[in-house]
A protein has these predicted regions:
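Pepsin/retropepsin-fold aspartyl endopeptidases
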Residues: 1-142
Length: 142
C-alpha cells in the first residue's frame, strides 16, 4: 500500500525464542508470542524498529545499547532481537527499540534477508532471492 510516497506492509513480529522452540517442535504455533503490525518500509533505515510497548508485550530479548543515526539525529538506542515475517518471507534481525506510539519500521537488513527490493516509483516491494531458507519457512507458516 502506498501512502504519500511511503510503502506500508503487513508484518508479523515474533519472539525469537518462542519461534525457535516452535520450529523445533517444542511449542505450538498459537503459543508463539507475535504481533501483526502495519509497518513502514524504510530504505534509509538499517534495522527494523518497534515501539517499546510492543517489544515488552512480545518479551523480545534486549541485547544492549548502541550508538545509531535515527531520524532525529545521533543517539544511543536499545537493541532487541525479533523474527519478522512479510508475506511468505522471514528474517531474523536486531530491532531498534523506539518510544511508545512510534511507527513500526522495516529497514534494509530485514528487507535484504527476505529478498525484497523496494521500488520507490511504484511504491511496491518486489521479491528476489531471500537469504533465509524458504522451505523451512513455508512449513511453519499457517
Amino acid at each position: 500500500v502506498v501512502v504519500l510516497g511511503h510503502i506500508y506492509v503487513d508484518a508479523v513480529f515474533y519472539n525469537p525464542v518462542d519461534y525457535a522452540e516452535f520450529t523445533q517442535g517444542r511449542r505450538r504455533l498459537e503459543d508463539v508470542r507475535r504481533a501483526g503490525l502495519r509497518s513502514l518500509v524504510d530504505t534509509g533505515a538499517t534495522f527494523p524498529a518497534l515501539p517499546e510497548d510492543v517489544v515488552g508485550e512480545l518479551g523480545l530479548p534486549i541485547y544492549g545499547e548502541a550508538e545509531a543515526e535515527v531520524a532525529t539525529g545521533r543517539e544511543r538506542v536499545r537493541l532487541a532481537l525479533a523474527i519478522i515475517q512479510t508475506e511468505d518471507r522471514t528474517a531474523a534481525s536486531y530491532v531498534i527499540v523506539r518510544p511508545r506510539g512510534t511507527t513500526p519500521l522495516i529497514g534494509v537488513v530485514a528487507l535484504e534477508q527476505m529478498g525484497f527490493r523496494a521500488d520507490p516509483v511504484t511504491g511496491k516491494l518486489f521479491k528476489g532471492l531471500p537469504l533465509m531458507p524458504l522451505e523451512k519457512i513455508k512449513n511453519t507458516i499457517r
